[in-house]
UniProtKB/Swiss-Prot annotation:
Substrate binds at residue 230. One of its GO terms (cellular component) is endoplasmic reticulum membrane. This is Cytochrome P450 1A1. The gene is cyp1a1. Cytochromes P450 are a group of heme-thiolate monooxygenases. In liver microsomes, this enzyme is involved in an NADPH-dependent electron transport pathway. It oxidizes a variety of structurally unrelated compounds, including steroids, fatty acids, and xenobiotics. The lineage of its organism: Eukaryota, Metazoa, Chordata, Craniata, Vertebrata.
Length: 520
């Protein structure tokens, strides 16, 4: 039968071929869907009916965190939908997500084989990789071991705290005393995101590479400016991820995405190569050195099951650098917006710092127990902004079930963190910004049980490996900023806090005024 159609191939146009191929794929998927056998005692996932070829893309829209939240109200905490030709599922509700990612962690620990993911760190990314479970776990363990050996997370007075504090103090001082003050004197306003993102990137560079860049260094600026388009593609998905035939058609978006990743890789590869040249096992200078050290040890270990290649080192460092500065800088940028929107909260934070830390020294991580309102403010920023609306998509590693519903192997699973953080069954008046919800009744202590309900870094086996550094970095930078600066809007310009969807949701860029606290 196949041989009979070969003579006609040369007379068929490209468009006709694509239509034919799409039709075949569509028929196959429809037949596959209706032939899916549901094990006895389980139910088929509920969800909206998909359109041919595009699935439920139109219903998901450009604000999927809102549309999928609306669908969860209709279909429940576990439902299916289709993005193009890819069967997908969405998990909402704190109990459901915790059950999936913790109790059934192995079954939901995979990553979908999305076309765009193959180009992130040349396919060597620890966060986006589809490596088999054993390989991925071994590499994650090595990465965490390298991070721990550099940061000594297990000690009561962590070495990473000292390093993080050192870099944060230097960058915080440069941020408020040099950059912001100089900019304010010249222009009368400043773009908070522009300066925060470079300062944070320098802290991450110090941790990963042991070096600092000037705030006008063009190489660093060009790289940090790539985080937005990267997040937009990963967050919204590339059409080729969900309609496979599009992989073979030219795409400006995909070309730009590949260029972004190539530039990131080139930057990190250069630094890793330099570290190999100057590496001294008796002088581990930073996270890159620590990863090289673990890599060398495993090369010498004949019994090691998984060898970590040089490319994997680049991928891990790239993950830590990219995710670290983007997460912290986005959180801090939102923090400044909330400080401006709620001046009475800004004043409470300043008074807490003034009374418990003073104004003559830089805040330290050991001050955290004495700054419960600042801790509550950070948690409420994480919850209210939900600037990480979804985790990186998960994938089922085998046929499984959840809440009585059958979920087939290789289902792309979205974890709706935004829904959890705005669930009225979990939070009183979730739309209001209220840091006091995380304090004890007398307002003197942080309510840690309430804080644990906030979903921001994922859960379980795929939980963000850099969570500790991210939380500590946000705390240190924000404490320094509140201690030294007071923010205001420009006269006649309203504050626009409308989020723009992406892997991390940003607010619209704006200009603000700032005054030094010491000069007030």
């Amino acid at each position: 039968m196949v041989l009979m159609i070969l003579p006609f191939i040369g007379s068929v146009s490209v468009s006709e071929s694509l239509v034919a191929l799409t039709t075949v794929c569509l028929v196959y998927l429809i037949l596959k869907f209706f032939r899916t056998e549901i094990p006895e005692g389980l139910h088929r996932l509920p969800g909206p009916k998909p359109l041919p070829l595009i699935g439920n893309v139109l219903e998901v829209g450009n604000k999927p965190y809102l549309s999928l939240t609306a669908m969860s109200k209709r279909y429940g905490d576990v439902f299916r939908f289709r993005l193009g030709m890819r069967p997908s599922g969405c998990l909402s509700g704190s109990e459901t997500v915790r059950k999936a990612l913790i109790k059934q962690g192995d079954e939901f620990a995979g990553r979908p084989d999305l076309y765009s993911f193959r180009f992130i760190n040349d396919g060597k990314s620890l966060a986006f990789s589809t490596d088999k479970a054993g390989v991925w776990r071994a590499l994650r363990k090595l990465a965490y071991s390298a991070l721990r050996s550099f940061s000594s997370l297990e000690e009561s007075t962590p070495r990473d705290s000292c390093v993080l504090e050192e870099h944060s103090a230097k960058e915080g001082e440069y941020l408020y005393s040099n950059m912001l003050n100089a900019v304010m004197k010249v222009t009368g306003s400043f773009d908070p995101f522009r300066h925060i993102v470079v300062s944070v990137a320098n802290v991450i560079c110090g941790m990963c590479f042991g070096r600092r860049y000037g705030h006008n260094d063009q190489e660093l600026l060009s790289l940090v400016n790539l985080s937005d388009p990267f997040g937009q593609v990963v967050g919204s998905g590339n059409p080729a991820d969900f309609i496979p035939v599009l992989q073979f058609l030219p795409s400006t978006t995909m070309k730009n995405f590949m260029d972004i990743n190539a530039r990131f890789n080139k930057f990190v590869q250069k630094i890793v190569s330099e570290h190999y040249t100057t590496y001294d096992k008796d002088n581990i200078r930073d996270i890159t050195d620590s990863l090289i050290d673990h890599c060398e040890d495993r090369k010498l270990d004949e019994n090691a099951n998984v060898q970590m290649s040089d490319e994997k080192i680049v991928g891990i460092v790239n993950d830590l650098f990219g995710a670290g500065f983007d997460t912290i800088s986005t959180a801090l940028s939102w923090s400044v917006m909330y400080l401006v929107a709620y001046p009475e909260i800004e004043e409470r934070l300043y008074q807490e710092l003034k009374e418990n830390v003073g104004l003559d020294r830089t805040p330290l991580l050991c001050d955290r127990p004495n700054l419960p309102f600042l801790e509550a403010f950070i948690l409420e920023i994480f919850r209210h902004s939900s600037f990480l609306p979804f985790t990186i998509p998960h994938c089922t590693s085998k046929d499984t079930s959840l809440n009585g519903y059958f979920i087939p192997k290789d289902t792309c699973v979205f974890i709706n963190q935004w829904q959890i953080n705005h669930d009225p069954e979990l939070w009183k008046d979730p739309s209001s910004f209220n840091p006091d919800r995380f304090l004890s009744a007398d307002g003197t202590e942080l309510n840690k049980l309430e804080g644990e309900k906030v979903m921001v870094f994922g859960l379980g086996k795929r939980r963000c490996i850099g969570e500790v550094i991210a939380r500590n970095g946000v705390f240190l930078f924000l404490a320094i900023i509140v201690q030294k600066l007071h923010f205001k809007t420009l006269p006649g310009e309203p504050l626009d806090m409308t989020p723009e969807y992406g892997l991390t949701m940003k607010h619209k860029r704006c200009h603000l005024r700032a005054t030094m606290r010491a000069s007030e």
